[in-house]
Amino acid sequence: MTTQIELKILDARIGTEYPLPAYATPGSAGMDLRALLDAPLTLAPGDTTLVPTGLAIHIQDPGLCATILPRSGLGHKHGIVLGNLVGLIDSDYQGQLMVSVWNRGNDNFTMQPGERIAQLVIMPVVQASFQLVDEFNQSERGEGGFGSSGRQ
């Protein structure tokens, strides 16, 4: 399935120095977002900062949203994750995509201009309405929570 989403380039380096976001393979779910910095940025352990991507999107379709997710290599190798864990972009948002970056590692990390820092995934949305009830129909699991389904 392919859906058209409006994209606004806010930084002239996109499309010249850095490519537009694109799927790396036919099976890719996410497109890489880059740090559109003017100079290298060093994050000390525990630091968080908002990093511009130089892009704005307008999804328009209320049946879709976008999520900003971490890149696995940055988190595993360097302790660089998203400060808000997951970024949710609503269909009616039109501003610049910013990435909250958190250095949860033990060493300084220097981010370079144009470095791939996160990925953008477009996802379907279901807007639910609630039906108030006094009791639920009994399920096999019931109220069992954290760890109740076992480890094996």
UniProtKB/Swiss-Prot annotation:
Its cofactor is Mg(2+). It is an enzyme of class 3 (hydrolase). One of its GO terms (molecular function) is magnesium ion binding. It catalyses: dUTP + H2O = dUMP + diphosphate + H(+). Its EC number is 3.6.1.23. GO terms for biological process: dUMP biosynthetic process; dUTP catabolic process. The keyword Magnesium applies. Pathway: Pyrimidine metabolism; dUMP biosynthesis; dUMP from dCTP (dUTP route): step 2/2. Keywords: Hydrolase, Magnesium, Metal-binding, Nucleotide metabolism. CDD domains: trimeric_dUTPase. Substrate binds at residues 71-73, 84, 88-90, 98. It comes from the Bacteria. This enzyme is involved in nucleotide metabolism: it produces dUMP, the immediate precursor of thymidine nucleotides and it decreases the intracellular concentration of dUTP so that uracil cannot be incorporated into DNA. Belongs to the dUTPase family. This is Deoxyuridine 5'-triphosphate nucleotidohydrolase. The lineage of its organism: Bacteria, Pseudomonadati, Pseudomonadota, Gammaproteobacteria, Aeromonadales.
